[in-house]
Amino acid sequence: HIEKAKELTGADRVIVIMSGDYVQRGTPAVLSKHSRAHMALLNGASVVLELPVCYSCASAEFFAKGAVSVLDGLGCIDALCFGSECGNLEHLTSIAHLLSAEPETYRHHLQSSLKNGMSFPAARCHALEKMTGDAYASQILSDPNNILGIEYLKALKELNSPIVPFTLKREFSGYHDTELHDCSSSASAIRKVLMNIPASPYLPKNISAQLSEQLPPGSLSIIQNEWNFSCPVEADDFSLLLKYRLLSEPHESLCKYQDVSEELSNRIIRNRNQFRSFGQFCTLLKTKELTYSRISRSLLHILLSITTEDMHAYQDNSCSYARILGFRKEHTDVLRAMKDHASIPIITKLGKSASLLSPEASRMLNQTSFASDLYESVISDKFGIPFTSEQQKQIIRV
């Protein structure tokens, strides 16, 4: 993706902003953020930034708003490149503009579909098809990377950002494709392979051979080195922590967490005695209106104490910062450009961040640091390694 982005945009420097230890599907990442940042740097990224956890495990809308606000705040970004199943920027832009405007006809069809029991994604597709009389737009909205791309475009428009968008068409496999292909497989397929490996002290040779056709050598080497030392991590590793949170929360307080509706809160309370694991509970709570990923994100928000009030405060105060996870030593000119042009704080050392941040941004960073410490504690317990706090982690230099 990085090399193709350079070709498409003509850029010679690339800043990657990525989820930290928790990702948008509402689960912990299989590999830690530092391992994945190292991969990105080995494969051509100049600088890797961490998207705060309140955005990284949020809906596509908030995920995109968070990412674009950071990139726009750097003041030195001239292009944004994202992958999409559609690959047609004109089509994605036209849908983004329509959804931003939310004309009366669209809102009417959306509300009608929601009242008829459709989930929000399905209702939005149906409303768009009704309004345009064309199934193509709703087909575009049925693919997750298209949805995220549209949200990036909406966020750029909302911020009146000068950043120029580009999109790369995802080839060979879709986001939800769980089978490996000869040339290029989805992250879901690679994740499935890793999570289905029986307990083993080393990454099995046959799996390494399979993955060598899918991943660059540096990325595969990191997985091999980290295997059974700090990865793989899965949602069920957090089951006991989540069960404690669900049992300790009174019924009336669950709705304060981001994405937890009254309907979902009631289902959690009614079914929490049947809790066996994180994944099992998501499946148990799932309905036609409540998708698995929506439930998974909601439970993660409860676990990490991310509230709706937090999100409103972050949005209302337009608070943001750029936390650097790593950089290439020969691309320090990018760091200088960020320092010279950024309108948001650049965080390199957590211990020195307090004086740079507003109260809301400080809470956002502390929330992210707590979430990473929780992730690290799970790794420490699962693999029997010493705990290393977020304060102790060093910036990766390649």
Ranges and model annotations:
Residues 22-28, 50-57:
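Acidic/glycine-enriched edge-of-secondary-structure segments
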Residues 1-36:
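N-terminal catalytic cores of NTP/NDP-binding nucleotidyl/phosphoryl-transfer enzymes
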Residues 6, 37-41, 154, 191:
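Class I S-adenosyl-L-methionine
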Residues 12, 46, 77-78:
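Conserved acidic residues
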Residues 6-7, 41, 68, 72-73:
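Non-catalytic positions within long, well-ordered alpha-helices that form the structural scaffold/packing
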Residues 51-398:
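Active-site cores that bind ATP or allylic diphosphates and position pyrophosphate for catalysis
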Residues 9, 44, 157-160:
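A broad structural signal for alpha-helix termini and local helix breaks/kinks
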